[in-house]
Amino acid sequence: SAGGGSSYIGNSDLSNKAMYCYNCATSNAANTKTISVTCHSDTATSNCAKEGAGYAKISYVKASTEDQEISNPSPAKFDYTGSVQEYTVIKTGKYKLQVWGAQGGSDSPSDGGVGGYSEGKIELTKGSKLYIAVGGQGSPYTRKAKSNGGFNGGGYGGIVNASSNPQ
């Protein structure tokens, strides 16, 4: 099976944020954290890999040492739509950005690899625009037709010979 569609939230200010890696052996990056191999869910759960389509969430947080999410303004939540979505910052302050990648396509009896998780906190100014691309799950492999990868870079299901089927 292959990887799912990537999810991301982006603007020019995003760099050096915490990255999570599902089932990674090691990493040299100072901010890389590992997601537990046993922690994956079909719902968006912090620090867990995601089954199915991807997801994204933007939350305003307090400027205190706790960085707790607060309810005003309400968190913006983004499900998979198959296209890039836009968010306009409604209040200047610190925001927590969370994204979950989509699951890859499957090839019976194996399920596609689950999507990863990433988060970061960033200061944003009212009126700034963020662009959100939530990954789509890769389609299952069938013997009759080649499957398609998910939206935003997702992998297709099935095992193929790369030299005879370049992507």
Which positions does each model-derived feature cover?
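C-terminal, surface-exposed recognition/capping segments
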Residues: A2-G54
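Residues that flank catalytic or metal-binding motifs in active/ligand-binding sites
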Residues: G3-G4, G52-G54, S83, G93, ...
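Acidic glycine-/aspartate-rich tracts in secreted/extracellular proteins
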Residues: L14, V61-T65, G101-G105, G135-Y141
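Extracellular beta-strand-rich recognition modules
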Residues: I35, S41, A56-I58, Y95-V99, ...
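Short, structured beta-strand segments at or near domain termini in extracellular proteins/domains
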Residues: K50-S64
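GGW-centered surface loops in extracellular recognition modules
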Residues: K57, E66-S106
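Histidine- and aromatic-enriched segments that form or immediately flank copper-ligand environments
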Residues: G101-E119
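Secretome/extracellular-domain signature
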Residues: V114-Q167
